Amino acid sequence: MPRVDLQKYNKKVENPVAILWRLVCYFKHCRLLLTAAMLSILAYVAATIGAAYCMKPLTNLLEASGAAPNETYAKYISLILGLAGLYLLSALTNYLLNRLMLECSAIIMKQLRTELFDTMQRQPVRFFDENKTGALMSYYTSDIEATNELLQHSITQLAISITSLLGTIGMMLALSMRLFAIMVVLGAIVVLVVRVTTRISKRTYASQQRLTAAVSGYMEEMITGQRDVKVFTHEKEVMEQFDVINRDLCKASTTATTVTSMVGPILNNLSHIFYAITCAVGVLWLTGEGAGGILIGFLQYVRTFADRVSQISEQFNALMMALAGAERIFAIQDLPSEEDQGQVTLEQNGDDYSWRLPDGALVPLRGDVRFAHVDFSYVPDKPVLRDLSLYAKPGQKIAFVGSTGAGKTTITNLINRFYDIESGSITYDGIDVRRIRKDDLRRSLGMVLQDTHLFTGTVMENIRYGRLEATDDECIRAAKIADAHYFISHLPQGYDTVLYSDGANLSQGQRQLVAIARAAVSRAPVLILDEATSSVDTRTEKLIGQGLDALMAGRTVFVIAHRLSTVRNANAIMVLEQGRIIERGDHRELLEQKGKYYQLCHNMIELT
């Protein structure tokens, strides 16, 4: 799968109409609520426009107040009551609309979060290796929040403003075509201003969203690596780097806010000028009976027209900010899922596993893994493995040693197909691993990593993560194999003790013991122990070793370790250097060769 660079999605919104339409399509999940909301908008707009129209007959009544005072008084009362009723209807429909849109946005946000999380889950490991956790989390936080604000308020207010604007134009045409012609000319000026401010807003808000993600990513990285920062006393340098990106974010936010704050005053001043021009032209052009009512009514609509145009402009600014977040969310959703063209599946019958071939034939899973002339690189033209060949017979323990970057962990990444090779082949019981479905392949592999990740939940739940259908007794037996039962039993609630924040309430060695128990309960025929005992003391390592010996019985095992004691009893030890196997053999054979492995043993050089 090609490298995924999310930076290309941090540009300005390229097609806001398409993004908005795609977002609007999510209203299909709440059609009834949307229908009720649209009816509420129509009722609200009709009430506000009707209330403005009442100014015309009220003005005419004031002009004719000298004749038939009783009749005029009765009309006053009826108009005032009607006006009060319209204002009440406006308030009620506005409240109802807000409630309906809150429910709609909650439903749509649930759907968006589900789709976003599902897309993330279907991405390959390469995707997470190449993108910072903080930057990815910003999609779930700032971008989701911006989109939620768009759905709750921006779209609603924009719909109200546009509907009200159209209704206002209709009433203005009905009152005076000549005055409306003046408004068309003045409106063209407003449209020009709106287009200019909208274009600026798109750039500033996209930049703000991009820098927000950068700050989140940097903070997450520094908080996670705080121990290393303090060990090397780089607090000052970290703070200086943070100040740089934080200053950029502050500058972008200030620019975006400045643009927004300028729009309102500019349009308000324009509306005052247009109001005065319309009033002056109306006095000169309108004559005859009822002219005063027409002018007052028209001016009321001019005010409404100007307000709606101003609101639309401001709402477009908010819309652009929200659309920048929505576009980033959709960019993630549009990423292709991890490719898997495998057709060979894994079948289990008790403790026995078999591969089911496409033709229906069964191949017993024995744990025979072979690499043949494998080449691989994470980045083009920078090879990590070169013409690598090795094999692990069923039940053998294969150990990898070598300096950092030699390719040890890469080999295990290729076995479980976190990455795919560029040339050569990897076979599993004679089957090319690319023919095996990835989930079935990984189900046949148990892994224990040095950087153990534990989920929020009880100790029992974390062990059961290795095989969700495992019983409590099976989890306890696995913990005993990993020599974790003793310390777990002495926790405050034993196996029901809740672990927080990646197992922060356990020591590093205890976390690794839980991870080994998780691998034990999985019953995987092949085990990958990536520096599995490098984070525990010698005594604990010895106890784990005893448990692992029982765990590894009858299984094919790949081991990467810091310490020579971890690999002494391996059937074969592979010494890697710059992506090549430079020595291979068991512990005794390699010592007799007096090569790199011999130097590691006698000079006590670290293996990794």
Label each residue range with its predicted role:
Residues 29-43, 86, 153-207, 277-292, ...:
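Transmembrane helices of ABC transporter permease
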Residues 64-69, 85, 171-185, 255-328, ...:
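Helix-loop-helix
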Residues 350-608:
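ABC-type nucleotide-binding domain
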